[in-house]
Every structure is written in C-alpha cells, then in structure tokens.
C-alpha cells in the first residue's frame, strides 16, 4: 500500500521548525542549476518556505508546491502574493501527481522520501512529469549516519524509538544513501551526489514533547530534559543528488 506519513507529525512546534527551512539553507546544492523562466515542482513542500526560495530563483517561472497536508500553505501563499512571486500550492500525493506528462523543467524534493512507503513509485511519477533533459534535485536524511552524544541514555533511547516507528510503518530511514541507485532505476542520468551534516540538537529539544505525545513514548521527553545543561549533541546525515531525465 502506497502511503505518505510525516513521522514527526504536524504539531505547532514541528510546523514552526519546518518553516525555518529556506532554499538557501536546505536547497543550496540545487539552486545553481535553476534557470529563470523554468517551471519547477516542489514535491512534499511542507509549509512552502523552500518553495518561495525556488520561485525567487526562476522568476518569472512558475513554481508549484504540493503536499498532502494543505493546512500548512497559508503563510507562504500570503508571502508569495506580497512579493509578486509566481507560486502555486496544491494538495496532492507524489504517487498520483495531478499534472500532464513532461510539463516541468525541474523537480525538487526535500525530506520526503524517508517518509514514503514506496519511494520508487514516486520516482516514476517524477520522471513522468519532467520534460526531456529536465533536472531533479533530491535531499534525504539517512538515520544510519546520525551522531548522538549525551550524559544520559535517554536521548539515544528516544531516537531508537523514533527509528523503530519509522521501520514499523514501512519507511526507509536509510534512503539517503540510496538516492543514486533509485535515480538510475527510475531512468535518470545521475549528475552529482553529495553528503552533509546538520546539527539538529535544538530541533529535537523543541519537538521532543510532540513526538512523545504522538507515540506515547516517554523516552522522547528526555530530549527536552537536556535543554538546561547543554549535554546533548545530535547531528543528522543528509544526502543530496541531482539527476537528469534522459
């Protein structure tokens, strides 16, 4: 069964943190590839803050952001209107994109594949809507490379619980390292693949209680407990890939 579930949920703290992501901080590897006038799809756009950055890059081109949770779009819609950006937000699933074949010059996808039960099916749709020689830019986390240090065992236990829930729901927490393989299998020519780290300590401190409530897992709460003594360090591995439709 093809499903897309955002494991951290959509609580106010989670949405607030997602909204802090920008194209400059989380799509930097792909921005130089974009050309003014292009039509771009931002798949799994969340609150749309990255979408806005992509739109600024391709003015006067159209950037379309899609997500299964459309309650996130309001602020970015207002911002796009105030800046005069050519942006459209739509509720849609990457498994069934509501677009004609070969209509986008580029597809961007950030932090989505690790939340899909069938990433390969999404790649098939990405390939369908891309024009010939169109570009795809992907960024996905890889939990196999996560770094954790704390004076307490609680944070590591909390992250282990999070990882177990992802795997139980048929999500691949190690999809980042597989981006090149997935691109090739979907018929793309792999142009570039890189990896990077992001320190996410503050992020986890803020969303720990939300995760605890969602999964009824008290070990998540220990993340919040470490806020005062600064003993916690967590860094997440990201993998980035660029492909071209053949």
Sequence positions of predicted segments:
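A short acidic, Gly/Pro-enriched loop at the edge of an enzyme's catalytic core
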Residues: 95-106
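A short SAM/SAH-binding and catalytic strip from SAM-dependent methyltransferases
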Residues: 105-118
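A short glycine-rich, Lys/Arg-flanked "PGG" loop and its adjoining helix->strand segment in the class I
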Residues: 120-135
């Amino acid at each position: 069964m093809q499903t897309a579930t955002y494991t951290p949920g959509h609580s106010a703290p989670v949405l607030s943190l997602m909204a802090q992501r920008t194209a400059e901080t989380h799509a930097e590897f792909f921005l130089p590839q974009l050309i003014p006038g292009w039509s771009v799809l931002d798949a799994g756009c969340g609150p749309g803050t990255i979408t806005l950055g992509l739109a600024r890059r391709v003015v006067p081109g159209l950037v379309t952001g899609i997500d299964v949770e459309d309650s996130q779009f309001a602020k970015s819609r207002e911002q796009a209107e105030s800046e005069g950006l050519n942006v459209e937000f739509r509720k849609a699933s990457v498994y069934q994109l509501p677009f004609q074949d070969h209509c986008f010059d580029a597809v961007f996808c950030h932090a989505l594949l690790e939340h899909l039960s069938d990433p390969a099916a999404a790649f098939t749709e990405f390939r369908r809507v891309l024009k010939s020689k169109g570009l795809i830019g992907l960024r996905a986390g890889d939990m196999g490379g996560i770094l954790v240090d704390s004076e307490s065992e609680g944070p590591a236990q909390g992250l282990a619980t999070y990882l177990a829930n992802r795997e139980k729901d048929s999500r691949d927490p190690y999809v980042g390292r597989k981006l090149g393989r997935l691109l090739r299998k979907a018929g793309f020519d792999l142009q570039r693949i890189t990896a990077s780290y992001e320190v996410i300590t503050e992020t986890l401190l803020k969303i720990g209680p939300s995760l605890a409530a969602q999964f009824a897992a008290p070990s998540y709460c220990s993340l919040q407990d470490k806020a005062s003594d600064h003993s916690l360090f967590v860094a997440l591995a990201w993998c980035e890939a660029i492909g071209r439709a053949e």
